[in-house]
Every structure is written in C-alpha cells, then in structure tokens.
From Swiss-Prot:
Species assigned in the record: Influenza B virus (strain B/Bangkok/163/1990)
Disulfide bonds: none
Descriptive protein name: Hemagglutinin
Gene3D superfamilies assigned: 3.90.209.20, Hemagglutinin Chain A, Domain 2 (2.10.77.10)
Keywords recorded for this protein, A-Z: Disulfide bond, Fusion of virus membrane with host endosomal membrane, Fusion of virus membrane with host membrane, Glycoprotein, Hemagglutinin, Host cell membrane, Host membrane, Host-virus interaction, Lipoprotein, Membrane, Palmitate, Signal, Transmembrane, Viral attachment to host cell, Viral envelope protein, Viral penetration into host cytoplasm, Virion, Virus entry into host cell
Family under the similarity heading: Belongs to the influenza viruses hemagglutinin family.
Chief place where the protein resides: virion
Miscellaneous comment as given in the Swiss-Prot or TrEMBL entry: Major glycoprotein, comprises over 80% of the envelope proteins present in virus particle.
Maturation and modification: In natural infection, inactive HA is matured into HA1 and HA2 outside the cell by one or more trypsin-like, arginine-specific endoprotease secreted by the bronchial epithelial cells. One identified protease that may be involved in this process is secreted in lungs by club cells. Palmitoylated.
Positions glycosylated per UniProt: N40, N74, N160, N179, N246, N317, N346
Length: 360
C-alpha cells in the first residue's frame, strides 16, 4: 500500500487561524466491493483484457495438428481418413488439433451418401487421438471372404501410383467373380490386429446402384441388408436401389451408383462382426490410434505460436488472468472468461480534502 502523508499545518498570526487535515488528489478509479459497493480508490491494476480476432497458431509447448496429413496435397481430411489413393501419408502426433473443415466434407473416388451414417465424424474421431497410424496389413482377405471368390472393384476417379484406377485402402469393393446370384446374409469376423494396445478404427460400407447395374455386378437388383456389431452395439442398414443422379468425382466418369461408408471402433482384443449381402465394401487396412489430442474448431494456416487457442478469437497470448467478450471453448494456458471487467485495487480508499475550518 502507498503511504499516506498526513500534513498538519497550524498557522498562528494576529489574523484568523486556518487548519487543514488529510489531503489527496481526486481519483478516477472506481471499484465494486462486497461490503461497501462502489468505492473510489487511488490506484488499480486491470485484470481483464478484451481480445481481438486473430489467426490460429501452434499451441506453445505442444505439437498442434492442422490437416490430418500435411504432406497429402489436394486431399480433404476425409480423403485421408478413408485412405484414398494419393492421400496416404504420415499423420503427425499432436496434443492439440484444429477442426478446420466445414460441412459438407467431401471425398473423391466415389460418390458417398454422407447423411446415412456418421462417416463425416471419422476425421474428427481420428483428430481426437494423439497418435494415429494406418496398419500395414489388411484385416481380412477380401477376395476369399464368405460369398466369394471376389474380384476387387475400382474407380477411375481413384488413380494410384501404378494404375489409373483404384479404391480406398481402408475398404475392398467385393464384386463376385462368377457366382453373380442373390445370397442370404453372410457373416465375416473382423479381428483386432493393432499391436500396441490402441483403439482400432475399422472402416466398411456397401455399394448400391440402379437395377441394371445391380444385376450386372451382383446378379440381384433387390435392396440388400447389412449389419455391423462391436462392443455390444449393432447397426443395421438396407441399401437403396436406383434414383441417383449421375455424379462425377474429381474428373472421373459419371457414376450412377453410391456408396455408404461407416466405421466401428474396436477396443484391444475385441472382435467385430459384419453381416452382409451383395455390394459389401469389406474392411482392409485399419487405423490404430492411441492417446488423446484436445480438439478445437479453428482455421488454417497455423501462424506462429500462442499461449491459448480460442474458438472465437484464434491464438491468444495471456497478458491478463481474465478476459471479457465472447465466451467459447479454449485450450492451452488461457485467461478465464468473466462477464464484466475486474480490477485489483493497489492504492488506498480515496478521501476528499478536508474542509477548511475557520476559527475566530
């Protein structure tokens, strides 16, 4: 606290005697106290700041992930999550991740019916893990799966390094080689193949088309039934036949069909089950993921470093312990949101100058 100088002047003369008491200058600082309401004080320290919007940044002291695969050029995060050819690369480990893509999330290779499953959530699911890797081996032998033998279908919109036609590495498009007939529901078990106790994210789906194409590919033009089961959760689907407008993906041929893609999360040692009919997209390479990465909505590119990442303001450096303005999710070493500004009184209570006393 600042010391108060008390000056007592006594002037004696033949004239009147004038006394002055405690004096201080006028104070513009007002603080609200719990017991006395608003009080004028001689000094305050501001404890709050009101941020302005800025670019997002890397979080100080941690690895921050923007795109799932920074080196996968011209690829959406869904492309990476489905392992589209030319979009397969290393996903860096990170303690914090930026959710930067807006809906609708798209992927090339083949038109996807996004709204029938939770597939749009797959990139965000992966983003929530600190460490993510794609398995080197396939989880099942798709060509010899029940109902086969199968040839593996491809799309001209999915060129890879060796061919002008390919498909997602996470799935195998199972097209019967010779036995193009209707089939009763078939069952395949999906084993756990991750090797480090990670969560296993297994992608699968099914293809449907108009009646002519369904007969040509599968020998059955009726709606097909599909089921996935894992960790006690079972999901059912029935394919839609026809009624799709032609759609072109990334300069490929117009497609009259659609694919529905879903995923299941297998905990260590847990086996999943897929029950299917014609048109199944059998799981192949799986994601093995571990650790936790904090996820926040933001935008790219990430420029520089910041103490805090805030969904509304971007990267913030903590100059005060509290902030006012828009309240939103934030991660890192962040100020605390308060509704009104806070001040710390570091002076004394203001006292007005004593009245002049005139004695006769």
């Amino acid at each position: 606290m600042k010391a108060i100088i008390v000056l007592l002047m006594v002037v004696t003369s033949n004239a009147d005697r004038i006394c002055t008491g405690i004096t201080s200058s006028n104070s513009p600082h007002v603080v609200k106290t719990a017991t006395q309401g608003e009080v004028n004080v001689t000094g305050v320290i501001p404890l709050t700041t009101t941020p302005t919007k800025s670019h997002f940044a890397n979080l100080k002291g941690t690895k921050t992930r923007g795109k799932l695969c920074p080196n996968c050029l011209n690829c959406t995060d869904l492309d990476v999550a489905l392992a589209r050819p030319m979009c397969i690369g290393t996903i860096p480990s990170a303690k914090a991740s930026i959710l930067h893509e807006v809906r609708p999330v798209t992927s090339g290779c083949f038109p996807i019916m996004h709204d029938r499953t939770k597939i749009r959530q797959l990139p965000n699911l992966l983003r929530g893990y600190e460490n993510i890797r794609l398995s080197t081996h396939n989880v099942i032998n798709a060509e010899r799966a029940p109902g086969g033998p199968y040839r593996l279908g491809t799309s001209g919109s999915c060129p890879n390094v060796t061919s002008k036609s390919g498909f997602f590495a996470t799935m195998a498009w199972a097209v019967p080689r010779d036995n193009k007939t209707a089939t009763n529901p078939l069952t395949v078990e999906v084993p756990y193949i991750c090797t480090k106790g990670e969560d296993q994210i297994t992608v699968w789906g099914f293809h449907s088309d108009n009646k002519n194409q369904m007969n040509k590919l599968y020998g059955d033009s009726n709606p097909q039934k599909f089921t996935s089961s894992v960790n006690g959760v079972t999901t059912h689907y029935v394919s839609q036949i026809g009624g799709f407008p032609n759609q072109t993906e990334d300069g490929g041929l117009p497609q009259s069909g659609r694919i529905v893609v879903d995923y299941m999360v297998q905990k260590p040692g847990k086996t999943g089950t897929i029950v299917y009919q014609r048109g199944v997209l059998l799981p192949q390479k799986v994601w093995c993921a571990s650790g936790r990465s904090k996820v926040i909505k933001g935008s790219l590119p990430l420029i520089g470093e910041a103490d805090c990442l805030h969904e509304k303001y971007g990267g913030l450096n903590k100059s005060k312990p509290y902030y006012t303005g828009e309240h939103a999710k934030a991660i890192g070493n962040c100020p605390i949101w308060v509704k009104t500004p806070l001040k710390l009184a570091n002076g004394t209570k203001y006292r007005p100058p004593a009245k002049l006393l005139k004695e006769r």
